[in-house]
Amino acid sequence: AEFIVFRLMGYLAIACTYVIALSLVVGLIASLLGPGDQIIRLSDLPVWLGIGFATTLVLAAYGSIFNAMGLISPKYGVYLCIVFGIWEFMMGSFSIVNPNWTVASVSISHWALQMIDAMVLLAWPDTIQWAEMDNAFGIDSGLSVFWQPPVHTLGTASAGVALLNSVLVLLMVSVAWIFIAKSVFSRREIM
């Protein structure tokens, strides 16, 4: 298992450093360019850091899945990964349209989008009010298309609970696929 974990950690060290740095740069640019009472809107930075953190967890989950698929079938693993990628794209699209669909909750992209929706609600608590104003007055701002309140709150309607659920699910997916890869790898010889 150490070989698989070290391989994944090396990949994450490079990819996640880039993603977090990119999210900070984009967050800083967005906070400078967006309208606000101050020169820099610091309330934007938690959202962009949340996007970076969600992307980091998604990279860990996808990395462990693709690593395991490559170990399960060295010859056809790449084709399995392509099919899985198409599945994830479809489920991500379904999650944007309606996050309440049960079929979408079996995808990694759904949980990442739920995590980002929860971060938006934690950073900007009036987002629900703005979405309701859009619906009430028929304003087509696009908010209702790209943002939905998080649905996995265990009945509490709390964005913090939804964020915690999303983090735990993404971590459990990563750990489960690492153990699957470990069990496959333990039966093979290193050439």
Role assignments for model-derived ranges:
Residues 4-74:
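Secretory targeting signals
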Residues 13-15, 22, 89-92, 189:
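A short hydrophobic/aromatic micro-motif that marks alpha-helical segments and, especially, helix-coil
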Residues 18, 22-30, 92-95, 177, ...:
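Structural signal for membrane-spanning alpha-helices in multi-pass inner-membrane proteins
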Residues 38-44, 157, 187-190:
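C-terminal or late-domain output modules
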Residues 68, 168-191:
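Junction motif at the cytosolic side of a transmembrane helix
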Residues 77, 81-175, 179:
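Terminal transmembrane helical anchor/hairpin motif
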